[in-house]
């Protein structure tokens, strides 16, 4: 139990760079969560001292050297790249992944986090999911976290996951404990109505209920989206 005046400081980062940014929990709830539930992504705060953060154009290819034209304007969603004293410069004996994840900038190295996000006018970073999990449909890009947090605000939804098997944006839904299977048709109808009310979600064409999402063993929290996508295909739902 925290004291009444206590707070938590969840860090944003990765094995290759930790921490990158941080925002007090009270500020997340009071100042940013309402925007999260409208599809803005999750605010992870300001960069910590000695860390530089840039948001660059999304690419699945290696980028050998940094150039100013890679950087996006505030408010645009792109790849998150960081540099600083706690950022690793290479993967041991792994040139292919080093080339895909590191960008040379003179004497410095930028690390591509593998995440997508955007920066607001206050300099805060907003997390929008993993780059590899984005869904491409009809020339547009859908990002997982902005979409999912809209639906997660529904009282019957425990968690949701956007996947895109065969290019069809599909929302997998795990319901809160105690929700009956018989309630699903009405919940699905409500979720479809919510989807049409937001530009981040109005391309979602499938809503499927999953009994219990696959998650990683280490954290018991990271959703196995690849497994969910295969499950959707195997069920003939895509």
Q: What is the meaning of each model-derived region?
A:
Residues 15, 141, 154-159, 175-211:
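Conserved C-terminal helical docking segment of ANL/AMP-forming enzymes
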Residues 38-47, 70-71, 107-108:
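Short Gly/Pro-enriched turn/cap motifs at secondary-structure boundaries
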Residues 65-67, 114-116, 153-177:
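C-terminal boundary motif of the adenylate-forming
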Residues 62, 70-141, 153:
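Conserved ATP-binding/catalytic segment of the ANL
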Residues 13, 45, 115:
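Active-site glycine-centered loops adjacent to acidic/histidine catalytic or metal-binding residues
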Residues 135, 161-162, 171, 192-238:
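Conserved C-terminal "lid"/linker of ANL adenylate-forming enzymes
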Residues 1-39, 52:
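Gly/Ser/Thr-rich phosphate-binding loop
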């Amino acid at each position: 139990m925290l004291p009444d005046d206590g707070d938590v400081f969840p860090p944003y980062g990765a094995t290759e760079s930790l921490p990158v940014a941080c925002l007090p929990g009270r500020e997340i709830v009071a100042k940013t969560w309402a925007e999260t539930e409208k599809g803005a992504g999750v605010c992870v705060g300001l960069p910590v001292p000695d860390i530089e953060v840039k948001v660059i154009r999304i690419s699945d290819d290696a980028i050998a050297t940094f150039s100013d034209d890679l950087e996006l304007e505030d408010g645009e969603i792109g790849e998150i790249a960081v540099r600083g004293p706690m950022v690793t410069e290479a993967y041991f004996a792994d040139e292919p992944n080093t080339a895909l994840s590191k960008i040379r900038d003179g004497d410095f190295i930028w690390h591509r986090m593998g995440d997508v996000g955007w920066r607001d006018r206050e300099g805060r970073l907003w997390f929008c999911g993993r780059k590899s999990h984005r869904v491409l449909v009809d020339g547009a890009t859908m990002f997982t976290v902005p979409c999912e947090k809209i639906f997660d605000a529904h009282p019957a939804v425990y968690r949701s996951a956007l996947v895109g098997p065969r290019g069809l944006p599909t929302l997998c839904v795990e319901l809160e404990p105690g929700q009956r299977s018989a309630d699903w048709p009405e919940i699905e109808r409500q979720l479809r109505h919510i989807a049409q009310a937001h530009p981040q979600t109005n391309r979602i064409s499938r809503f499927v209920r999953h009994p219990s999402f696959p998650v990683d063993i280490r954290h018991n929290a990271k959703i196995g989206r690849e497994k969910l996508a295969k499950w959707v295909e195997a069920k003939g739902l895509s």
